Each structure stands twice: as C-alpha cells, then as structure tokens.
From Swiss-Prot:
Its EC number is 3.1.3.48. Dephosphorylates Wzc. Required for the extracellular polysaccharide colanic acid synthesis. Probably involved in the export of colanic acid from the cell to medium. Involved in protection of cells against contact-dependent growth inhibition (CDI). SUPFAM superfamilies: Phosphotyrosine protein phosphatases I (SSF52788). This is Low molecular weight protein-tyrosine-phosphatase Wzb. It comes from Salmonella typhi. The gene is wzb. Coiled coil: none annotated. Pathway: Glycan metabolism; exopolysaccharide biosynthesis. GO terms for molecular function: protein tyrosine phosphatase activity. It catalyses: O-phospho-L-tyrosyl-[protein] + H2O = L-tyrosyl-[protein] + phosphate. The lineage of its organism: Bacteria, Pseudomonadati, Pseudomonadota, Gammaproteobacteria, Enterobacterales. Keywords: Exopolysaccharide synthesis, Hydrolase, Protein phosphatase. It holds the Pfam family LMWPc.
Length: 149
C-alpha cells in the first residue's frame, strides 16, 4: 500500500510542488512531499507556477525546494517523476529504489510532463492541466488499491 508519496522533478519549484499539492487535494489521507534532482534548494515555488496554481484555487505557499537523496527516497513508498530520464537519475542515486519509481503521468499513457521553467504562462497552464489530470488518475488508482470508490 502506498501511503507516503514523493514527487520529483528537476528544480522542485514548478512541476513537483504543484503535483504534490494536487495529490494532497485529491487524496487528503496521503503523506505527499516533493524534491528535485537539481533542486533550487531553499527557493519557493516559481512565481508563474504559483500564479497558475492560484488561478485554479491551489496554493503553493510555503513551498521550499529541497534536494533528492537516497536517504529521502527510502522514506517513501512510491516515488513519482515527471520524465523518464528522472527515473534513470533516481536509479543512479539509489538503485534499490527502482521498483517504487514511476512516472507521474503513468495512468495517462506513460506521458512525460514537460518542464515549463522560464517559459510562457501558456506553457505553465498546459503543464498544470497535465498535472491535474495525472493527480486525479493517481488518486483514483490509489483509492481503488485501498478498496475505496
């Protein structure tokens, strides 16, 4: 059973904090956190990501970027990444974690979710839509696993 989920992207300021908060919204009983492979440690959410999230009534307030580590990975039951190359990078950091690493877009035809960092607001909106859809799909799958409707 997956009760603790870690969401991973590169900087931990755009995609993973948004995905973290969306998973918490759709499945409040989960423990969800996020981290980055090349995190902008200590930074808050990207202003464009925060603005788009806010437009959808989702707050990224008080987010603080942190760096992924093998130790951090071991604390979670499931690790969700935005891109396939992130899976490979995590396996380099902690090879024993491979069996619990999947794409955030797994239920959406194994879709990779592109990085909107330093791109247009439209790019952030498109990524938000992908993240929201995938978060809903994960919440449904996790509810089914736990025998909930």
């Amino acid at each position: 059973m997956f009760n603790k989920i870690l969401v991973v992207c590169v900087g931990n300021v755009c995609r993973s904090p948004t995905a973290e908060r969306l998973l918490k919204r759709f499945h409040p009983s989960l423990t969800v956190a996020s981290a980055g492979l090349g995190a902008l440690v200590g930074k808050g959410a990207d202003p464009a990501a925060a603005s788009v999230a806010s437009a959808h009534d989702l707050s990224l307030e008080n987010h603080c970027a942190r760096q992924i580590s093998a130790r951090l990975c071991r604390e979670y039951d499931l690790i969700l990444t935005m891109e396939k190359r992130h899976i490979a990078a995590l396996c380099d950091i902690a090879p024993e974690m491979r069996s619990k690493v999947m794409l955030f877009g797994h239920w959406d035809s194994e879709r990779e979710i592109p990085d909107p960092y330093r791109k247009s607001r439209d790019a952030f909106e498109a990524v938000y839509t992908l993240l929201e859809r995938s978060a809903r799909q994960w919440a449904q799958a996790l509810n089914a696993e736990q025998g909930k409707p």
